[in-house]
Structures are given as structure tokens and as C-alpha cells.
UniProtKB/Swiss-Prot annotation:
Protein name: Kappa-sparatoxin-Hv1e
Family note: Belongs to the neurotoxin 10 (Hwtx-1) family. 19 (HpTX2) subfamily.
Molecular function, one GO term: toxin activity
Organism: Heteropoda venatoria
Tissue: Expressed by the venom gland.
Length: 29
């Protein structure tokens, strides 16, 4: 999953947070 626009919404979308890149982004957010 590319989280829609890669990072946009990663902080609110739980599915995106589960992703490899978004998960790291969520962690540092």
C-alpha cells in the first residue's frame, strides 16, 4: 500500500501505519 500519496494520511490511517515505510514515519510522527 502506498498510503494514497505515500506519506499523506499515514498518521491517521491505521492500515498505512502497518506499512513498512509508513510504519517508520508513523513512529517518528
Amino acid at each position: 500500500d502506498d498510503c494514497g500519496t505515500l506519506f499523506s494520511g499515514c498518521d491517521t490511517s491505521k492500515d498505512c501505519c502497518e506499512g513498512y515505510v509508513c510504519h517508520l514515519w508513523c513512529k517518528y510522527k
